[in-house]
Amino acid sequence: MAKVDLSKYGISNNIIVVYNPSYEDLYKAEINSENKGFEKGIVTNTGAVSVDTGKFTGRSPKDRYIVKDQITENTIWWDGNINKPISRTIWDNLKDLTIKQLNTAKKLYIIDAFCGTNNDTRMKVRFIVEVAWQAHFVTNMFIRPSNYELDHYGDPDFVVFNGSKTTNPKWKEQGLNSEIYILFNLTEKEQIIGGTWYGGEMKKGMFSMQNYYLPLKGIASMHCSANVGEKGDVAVFFGLSGTGKTTLSADPKRYLIGDDEHGWDDNGIFNYEGGCYAKVIDLSQKNEPDIWNAIRRDALLENVTVKADGTLDYSKVASKTENTRVSYPIHHINKIVLPSRAGHAKKIIYLSADAFGVLPPVSVLDEKSSQYHFLCGYTSKLAGTERGITEPIPSFSPAFGEAFLTLHPTQYANVLAKKMKEHNATAYLVNTGWNGTNKRISIQDTRAIIDAIIDESIEKAEKIYIPILNLYVPKSLSGVSKGILDPRDTYTNRGEWEEKAKSLAAKYIKNFEQYLPEGEYLISSGPQLS
């Protein structure tokens, strides 16, 4: 590839620069004995390198801001929580701070990659980082250009400057949340990061940008995993972190398209990424063989306990965080589609980890209830995926990905509903959380439920109406434990379920008020208290 003139970014051309290094070169750099602090990588007995991201073991959404200017003023969803505005002055100050940090580096890594498998909609993204394992992370997670594509890469569509070693000393006077920052400038098409080492800020940053650009073109942008069967039947799994997107889409009977971020255009479903980013807390070979086997050379583990002999301890009791992760190139999964795209989706599955044991393991949705539950995006926030979350709490996340939405939720709902109607797709709400036994629904039962959705046997099953929640559930399904499909049966006292269900229904109803009066036609498709 042609040498990049760093001076246009304010970075000295005298710094040693490594362009799109090989996995072998990244491996050597990560385990270099001269590495200090969180730059250090540890070789594990699997061949994968493990790193520690410090105190930032998850994203920091409260430190995420977007420059408010003529381009973004009337397009960004300025909700004051997810998308918070900053001035151009603050941006300029913190970009200077980031560039100064990068100018102190002995060596920089430049990774030119693609975000999106479709040539006409993909973003060319340039990552400029000073930590070898961060270069490894984006090499795993984004689409790796061929040598020919690198030679003809040209100018990037977006540039990410990662200054994780610096912090913002002026954050209080600037009215920001803390000394760390994750900022976006859609006019300059740049992201800057300071103070946090967590690699997921780069991954989710570019997802947020695709969530801005693609729906404006009529393309659905989705926080989901996706796979495809032998007959070309595509299933999409929406869900927040920890609900099972990665685990359930890695199905040995089907081919993986991707595990987290996808678009849906006139040609079908396509992946934004070139890798997977799986949670590994309490990982077992029996329950998640594909992820287990993907942890080998070129995979990158985060915050996993490594014993003195190099063996890994995935157990919750041994881990510093519940958000232990591994990134790996998608070709570490045996059954994949390359390039990572397929036809139009037929099955839309909304995953929820209900911590309160109220939702059924599976509910069959119609067109309106599908839109209702997509806009609500109910789950329970699970420990570790964000700073400050240590216990499960009920959460409503529009589009099952509120933290990454840059446009109003209804824009995503409208585009998805249009695609589903055009291609006769059906939707289901699947609870991967808990029931009245205070135990989590087993992965074996959930997989059997997914099988019933895919093979459509769920459509033939007799349905039961669940009051209050206003949902229809199958009476029985092959391979699913008896007595769990109706959540009321998991309680020794049905009155306890009813009390919890009314409490959750009230939360649904209160949450949906934000979509009124426009969404009034959907109210009858949600939970009811009268």
Curated annotation (Swiss-Prot):
Cofactor note: Binds 1 Mn(2+) ion per subunit.
One cellular component term from this protein's GO annotations in UniProt: cytosol
Catalytic activity, as annotated: oxaloacetate + ATP = phosphoenolpyruvate + ADP + CO2
Residues at which substrate binds: 59, 198, 204, 325
Gene3D superfamilies: 3.90.228.20, Phosphoenolpyruvate Carboxykinase, domain 1, Phosphoenolpyruvate Carboxykinase, domain 2
GO MF annotations, alphabetized: ATP binding; metal ion binding; phosphoenolpyruvate carboxykinase (ATP) activity
Record bears the keyword Metal-binding: yes
Binding site for ATP: 204, 223, 239-247, 288, 325, 440-441, 446
Binding site for Mn(2+): 204, 223, 260
EC number(s) reported in the record: 4.1.1.49
Keywords attached to this entry: ATP-binding, Cytoplasm, Decarboxylase, Gluconeogenesis, Lyase, Manganese, Metal-binding, Nucleotide-binding
Family: Belongs to the phosphoenolpyruvate carboxykinase (ATP) family.
Entry function: Involved in the gluconeogenesis. Catalyzes the conversion of oxaloacetate (OAA) to phosphoenolpyruvate (PEP) through direct phosphoryl transfer between the nucleoside triphosphate and OAA.
Name this protein carries in UniProt: Phosphoenolpyruvate carboxykinase (ATP)
Natural source organism: Azobacteroides pseudotrichonymphae genomovar. CFP2
